[in-house]
Amino acid sequence: MMRLTLCFALAGAIWIQGLSDSTAQSLGFSKQGDGPIQIEADEGIEWQRAKQVYLAHGNARATQGGVSVEGDELIAHYKPNAAGENEIYRINANGNVRITSESEVAVSDNAVYDIDNGVLVMTGDTIRLDTAEDTIIARESLEYYEQQQMAIARGDALAIRDDRRLRADTLTAHFGEGGRSASMDRIEANGNVLVSTPTDIVRAEQGDYNPDRGLATLTGNVKITRGDTQLNGDRAEVNLTTGESRLLSSRSGERVRGLFLPKSSSGNGAGQPSNTGPTGNQ
């Protein structure tokens, strides 16, 4: 099958330059120069002047430098600029979307990139972003906001680094400086928060996590479970690097509560807590 190829020297450069600038500093897409973009498709490429769009159908792919955007269909919306040239302001990618750079891969069912406002939204049943250090998975959407240097994962969202996992209804990731090499330096978790270490399961309503330090502060109906031991309170600190969990009393003075199940005669003795359980402070 002949694969159709089209090269946009100006409009394509605007598209990829916009995409790269907006995502490179947090999601890690490589920042490219002003070279042309090459669009390929198995079934055809259309230029619909009346609608001011370019359409690429069938295993469509747009590439420039180290950045590649793939999908069953790519739609590029353009408008005339002050110089009378066609300037692409929005890209829609539909079906089996895959965005890759030298060290990052993002996949989803659909994606919309608003170049004018610097907002990228990926949607679908399973959205996944893999960077050099981190993985983010979402079931509803993954949004990236250029000016705020922030990504929001919605729907049973999961952040993974090594064997550390943070799950919540919504995860908001804040990125540091450093261009393509930047990584997440803070994650806010809201709703049904769950943190897992090799030994503990911690549940809460909200959380604030520093991935580099491996430290998470959790608040709201906190429950720490390790084996048969459970501690309940309002606040907790979890070190996902060492696996240590520490339950703290609330600022209102509410006491920490612990549940320690009796051990068998071969264990620590009936009614005695395990010496490996999580710690609690009043």
What role is predicted for each listed range?
Residues 1-2:
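N-terminal secretory signal peptides that target proteins for export/translocation
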Residues 5-17:
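Bacterial N-terminal signal peptides
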Residues 20-282:
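N-terminal amphipathic/hydrophobic interface segments
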